[in-house]
A protein has these predicted regions:
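Catalytic cores of RNA-modifying enzymes
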Residues: 2-254, 357, 361, 369-370, ...
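C-terminal target-recognition/interaction regions appended to catalytic cores
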Residues: 4, 34-47, 260, 270-275, ...
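Substrate-binding/catalytic lobe of Class I Rossmann-like enzymes that use SAM or dcSAM, i.e.
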Residues: 202-325, 331-332
Length: 388
């Protein structure tokens, strides 16, 4: 029986750290792409002590090796000499060393301690270690320090939640130049009416503008991935709509659960009507308590702190709600859709302005989509929403 290595070996020699390594790396990349299967890279032994390490495709470890493309990314990022740049997933530092030459400081977040060791050595060899700060941690769990720009070849597996963390994270920055999976980038760039248009684009474009820069062939990476990539630039907007972000995320989740169904069909479902009725009564009770100064607990089915109680509460709410009450509430929802001209429209063809208008119509009528009993955490909610 013949065993294949479960990851791609990358030999770290003096060649790797200099410009003349480009041809060497491309040769290895071509060889590896033909020899190794991405699906067999899960639990292979790491052998750092022999001056080589393994790159795990399952962890998104694909190193961009084309100097021309790296230089283009630096140019389009518009890095100033006083800027602090955040880089997610620096790997062995191909992009990092160029960022250090252009910026005052680079904060690199890398989860793989092996890569951190290589990165420190490489930066020390060119005498720029004073400009580099490395955080060896999962980027989704790390607390980012203040930064001006993001420039990164991010692991594809965390693209959605990471972008959510950046644009909704509360850290102001000028732009994020990101190398993403091509298909994902197309979804991010999609416009209403495009087949790729989705909730991802809607949520990002609420707070940021997205610009396409260029496509990058999969052959420019080591090891070679199965798909091509694209570079995009995300620029946060100076002004964003004054809305509750949790409410917006819950609303778009409802609308895009079946993006090609009409809104009338989506909102007429009995389960959805009951859910919105419950949330509406929760919000009304909370506002009544705020106005009267009462601070008593809501009924058990409004308590989001105990999962078991909350489940029992949903059953209690359903059993205590009459068909007449549900039908009246359903008619109210349909009336709002008809009033705004949305009943026969599909989410996949609506602009953000139209979606914001529809949400305002619902809220003005006292209908809400977010459970206001639960603690507000727009960042977590938004990041998690990308995955679905």
């Amino acid at each position: 029986m013949v065993f294949k290595p479960k990851s791609t070996p990358l030999y770290l020699s003096g060649l790797f750290f200099f410009h003349n390594s480009k041809r060497f790396l491309r040769t290895i990349s071509t060889h590896c792409s033909a020899k190794y299967d991405e699906e067999n890279d899960r639990n292979h032994e790491i052998r750092n002590q022999q001056h080589h390490l393994y790159l795990y495709k399952s962890k998104g470890q694909h190193l961009l090796t084309n100097t021309r493309i790296l230089d283009a990314i630096i140019r389009r990022s518009n890095i100033g000499p006083t800027d602090t740049v955040l880089e997610i997933g620096p790997g062995t530092g191909n992009l990092t060393v160029k960022l250090l030459e252009a910026a005052e400081k680079v904060v690199a977040v890398e989860i793989d301690a092996r890569m951190v060791d290589v990165l420190h050595k490489r930066v020390a060899d060119i005498g720029l270690q004073d400009r580099l700060h490395v955080i060896c941690k999962d980027a989704m769990k790390a607390e980012f320090p203040q930064f001006d720009l993001v420039v990164a070849n991010i692991p594809y597996g965390i693209s959605s939640p990471l972008i959510g963390k950046l644009v909704y994270g509360g850290n102001p920055f000028r732009s994020a130049t990101l190398l993403l999976q091509k298909e994902f980038a197309r979804r991010l760039l999609a416009k209403p009416g495009d087949s790729e248009f989705n909730r991802l684009a809607v949520n990002v474009k609420l707070v940021a503008d997205v610009e396409f820069v260029m496509d990058v062939s999969k052959r420019e990476f080591l090891p070679c991935p199965k798909v091509d990539s694209s570079v995009v630039i995300i620029r946060p907007k100076n002004e964003i709509p004054d809305i509750n972000l949790n409410e917006w995320c819950a609303f778009t989740r409802t609308c895009f659960s079946k993006k090609n169904k009409t809104l009338g069909a989506t909102f007429k479902q009995k389960k959805k009507v009951m859910q919105l009725l419950k949330l509406t009564e929760t919000t009304s009770l909370m506002r009544e308590n705020a106005l009267t100064g009462h601070n008593h607990e809501c009924d058990e089915y409004y308590d989001g702190n105990n999962e078991e109680e909350n489940t029992n509460g949903e059953d209690s709410f359903a059993s205590s709600t009459s068909d007449l009450e549900l039908n009246l509430f359903k008619e109210k929802i349909v009336g709002i859709l008809k009033k705004g001209g949305f009943e026969d429209k599909r989410p996949s063809k609506l602009s953000n302005e139209e979606l914001l208008h529809l949400l305002s119509l619902f809220n003005q009528a006292g209908i809400y989509f977010h459970d206001h009993v639960k603690p507000n955490n727009a960042n977590v909610d938004f990041a998690a929403a990308y995955v679905s």
